[in-house]
């Protein structure tokens, strides 16, 4: 009973960048190429993609961007013809990047505020997995001051300190019922913090090619004094007291290699390969401040595996004012079949993107992009909850950014 009631799924947020919970919409230019471009694009978004490239940017700049991530998933239980769909929701990850330093100097500094992890999903209270999850909303905001140095005209290095502020809000039904047959409800919310770093090296050989190597450390987000509230029949109130809880969510590290080559005077080809260290996420432990015979501290097995992603994209210089982009990618899931949960009904996925940048003036650029991700259909039986069925998931994510340069 305890295991059924309180294997609460704080776990991974919705995943829209590489799996698990990453949202790769920090740079709208790169988004238009499915996340490729860490070697090609040298601008203020390099704070995120590769701090070593930041020093090579020609201008100081401030860039503000936002996306509308629309996650739609459907579930059909084994031996049933009824399909249950998530409610339509929009998650708005955002990014703000600013770079500054002397023109043509050997150094440049910057700061980024962005949301690499986050999302929301709402299954409602009537689907077969209501005792697993009703809804989840999670966001991790990274604040990253960065320094970048030019060792030679072609070789740059850089690094940034990352401070994370994360929030979570989730609910699920409880298998205790009132006199009208309505199930109970558990609601958890809280804020956590963590720290990490981002390192990068960027090398280019005139107009022939560029290579990018970058590493983002894992961040252990510690959530303390979260609020746990329970709606149950009055007779069970003492077994489900309103209380506090703590938990720790390890957000994964990643190592990225990017390459770019000019195919001709107008067309560039870029590719990125990313290794993501999800194996750090082995279990999720909840420590409740107040325990009862029913409400005890719990441990939920995750056993995530490391994952890989590959992206390739084209950037076409259509005119002096307009660049057009397209890209595609394939991503391997870190989630093992027996540990698929409703908050991450994940599998390997295909993605495709288009995008543009239009130069409004000497000072302003406008970029836009749209990416679609098709998560492969997955039929699974959860090892702990025994929920068995097939998940189908699509993700749409348009985005826009405005850059001011000086």
Across the structure, where does each feature detected by a protein language model lie?
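Sec-dependent N-terminal signal peptides
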Residues: 4-13
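Outer-membrane beta-barrel pore proteins
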Residues: 38-60, 99-104, 151
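Short hydrophobic "helix-edge" motifs at membrane interfaces and signal-peptide entry regions
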Residues: 4, 39-42, 143, 352
């Amino acid at each position: 009973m305890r295991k059924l009631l309180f294997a609460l799924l704080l776990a991974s947020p919705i995943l829209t960048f590489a799996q698990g919970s990453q949202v790769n919409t920090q740079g709208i230019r790169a988004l238009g190429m499915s996340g490729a471009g860490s070697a090609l694009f040298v601008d203020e978004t390099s704070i995120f993609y590769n701090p070593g490239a930041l020093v090579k940017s020609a201008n100081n700049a401030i860039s503000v961007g936002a996306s509308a991530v629309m996650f739609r998933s459907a579930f059909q239980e084994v031996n049933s013809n009824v399909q249950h769909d998530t409610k339509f929701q929009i998650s708005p990850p955002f990014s703000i990047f600013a770079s500054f330093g002397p023109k043509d100097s050997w150094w440049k500094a910057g700061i980024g505020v962005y949301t690499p992890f986050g999302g929301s999903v709402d299954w409602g209270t009537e689907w077969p997995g209501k005792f697993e999850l009703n809804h989840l909303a999670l966001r991790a905001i990274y604040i990253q001051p960065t320094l970048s140095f030019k060792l030679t005209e072609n070789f740059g290095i850089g690094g940034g300190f990352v401070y994370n502020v994360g929030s979570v809000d989730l609910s699920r039904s409880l298998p205790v019922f009132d006199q009208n047959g309505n199930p109970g409800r558990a609601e958890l919310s809280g804020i956590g913090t963590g720290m990490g770093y981002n390192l990068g090296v960027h090398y280019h050989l005139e107009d022939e090619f560029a290579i990018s190597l970058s590493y983002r450390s894992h961040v252990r987000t510690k959530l303390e004094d979260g609020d746990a509230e329970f709606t149950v029949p009055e007779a069970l109130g003492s077994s489900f007291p309103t209380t506090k809880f703590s938990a720790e969510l390890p957000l994964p590290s990643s190592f990225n290699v990017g390459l770019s080559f000019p195919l001709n005077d107008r067309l560039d080809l870029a590719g990125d390969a990313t290794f993501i260290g999800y194996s750090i996420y082995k279990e999720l432990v909840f420590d409740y401040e107040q325990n009862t015979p029913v409400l005890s501290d719990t441990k939920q097995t995750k056993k995530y595996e490391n994952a890989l992603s590959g992206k390739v994209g084209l950037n076409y210089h259509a005119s002096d004012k307009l660049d057009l982009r397209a890209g595609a990618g394939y991503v391997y899931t870190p989630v093992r079949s027996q540990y698929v949960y409703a908050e991450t009904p994940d599998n390997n996925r295909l993605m495709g993107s288009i995008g543009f940048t239009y130069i409004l003036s000497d000072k302003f650029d406008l970029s836009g992009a749209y990416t679609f991700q098709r998560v492969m259909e997955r039929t699974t039986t959860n090892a702990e909850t025994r929920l068995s069925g097939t998940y189908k998931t699509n993700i749409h994510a348009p985005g826009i950014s405005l850059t001011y340069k000086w």
